């Protein structure tokens, strides 16, 4: 049981995935990033069900979530180095014997018939020899494991690319055209199509285990769309969502490699909140209420010239 408890922090410490702040990167976007953004957006737009708009003239309104911001990542996971590093140091017992030289001093004193002799022995204050003896074993041991955590100091700034919105809008228009739906200016349209792009960006992440490492780059596109008939105010397409993500991943062993590189495109999680369950209030008197039929000539929002153009007059 003790061994298991020791192995758990050893295996789990510094093992995890650190997800960086989504960013387009500085300067030019590199090819893999372009490929992923294009793949996720194409897949999401391709999934849009536009069968209810067959033969109609649609005015397209696309709104994209802003993608500007910045953030800091400071510090990280604790290092296992501070947990198990230790040392053992053993010194044998040591005894030193010093030999100090001795010398005798004799003094004789005579005065008339009296005399005295004084003899003294003194030691020098510096040893003439020293003998050191050690008993026992001498040993030194140390053990430790150092793992660099995934939390470095980082500062990333997201740079918005205004051409991304134009690219996505052109993709939507292309799909409309290929489906046989004509996209026209608002004054010539009989249908309004609203597309709200909630998610349109990338996510970078790094997985660091003791033996396995991976670099992952994902691009996600999530959108919601609906269509309204201008004459009847009827919902031709109730709010629907389309969400796809593309991924590029490099896998390493002890950060050697990559031994595997993969690309995937798959359906992503839907929006956390969508408008598919919203219905009009039962007592509403608004003229633009969905499914409320009215005469265009009595609609103050539509001019006579607009009606004439719709009818081809």
Swiss-Prot record:
Residues 1-14 form the signal peptide. This is Adhesin MafA 1/2. Belongs to the MafA family. Keywords: Cell adhesion, Cell outer membrane, Lipoprotein, Membrane, Palmitate, Signal, Virulence. The keyword tRNA-binding does not apply. It is a lipid-anchor. It comes from the Bacteria. Residues 282-313 are annotated as: Disordered. Its main location: membrane. One of its GO terms (cellular component) is cell outer membrane. It is found in: Cell outer membrane. A lipid is attached at residue 15 (N-palmitoyl cysteine). One of its GO terms (biological process) is cell adhesion. It comes from Neisseria meningitidis serogroup C (strain 053442). The gene is mafA1. A lipid is attached at residue 15 (S-diacylglycerol cysteine).
């Amino acid at each position: 049981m003790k061994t298991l408890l020791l192995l758990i922090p050893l295996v789990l410490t510094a093992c995890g995935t650190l997800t960086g702040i989504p960013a387009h990167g500085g300067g030019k976007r590199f090819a893999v990033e372009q490929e992923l953004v294009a793949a996720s957006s194409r897949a999401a737009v391709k999934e849009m069900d536009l069968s209810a708009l067959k033969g109609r003239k649609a005015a397209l309104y696309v709104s994209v979530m802003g993608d500007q911001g910045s953030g800091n990542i400071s510090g990280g996971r604790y290092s296992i180095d501070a947990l198990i590093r230790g040392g053992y140091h053993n010194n044998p017992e040591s005894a030193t014997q010093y030999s100090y030289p001795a010398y005798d001093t004799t003094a004789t004193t005579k005065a008339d018939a009296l005399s005295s002799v004084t003899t003294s022995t003194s030691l020098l204050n510096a040893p003439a020899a020293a003998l050191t003896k050690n008993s026992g074993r001498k040993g030194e041991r140390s053990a430790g494991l150092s793992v660099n955590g995934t939390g470095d100091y980082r500062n990333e700034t997201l740079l918005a690319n205004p051409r991304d919105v134009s690219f996505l809008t052109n993709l939507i228009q292309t799909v409309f055209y290929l489906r046989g739906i004509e996209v026209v200016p608002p004054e010539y349209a009989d249908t309004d199509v609203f597309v709200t792009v909630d998610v349109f960006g990338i996510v970078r992440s790094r997985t660091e285990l003791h033996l396995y490492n991976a670099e992952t780059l994902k691009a996600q596109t999530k959108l919601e769309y609906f269509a309204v008939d201008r004459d009847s105010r009827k919902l031709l397409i109730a709010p629907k969502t389309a969400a796809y993500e593309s991924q590029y991943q490099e896998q390493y062993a002890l950060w050697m490699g990559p031994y595997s590189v993969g690309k995937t495109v798959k359906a992503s999680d839907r929006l956390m909140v969508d408008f598919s369950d919203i219905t009009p209030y039962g007592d509403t008197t608004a003229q633009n209420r969905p499914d409320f039929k009215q005469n265009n000539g009595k609609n103050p929002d539509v001019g006579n010239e607009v009606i004439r153009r719709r009818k081809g007059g």
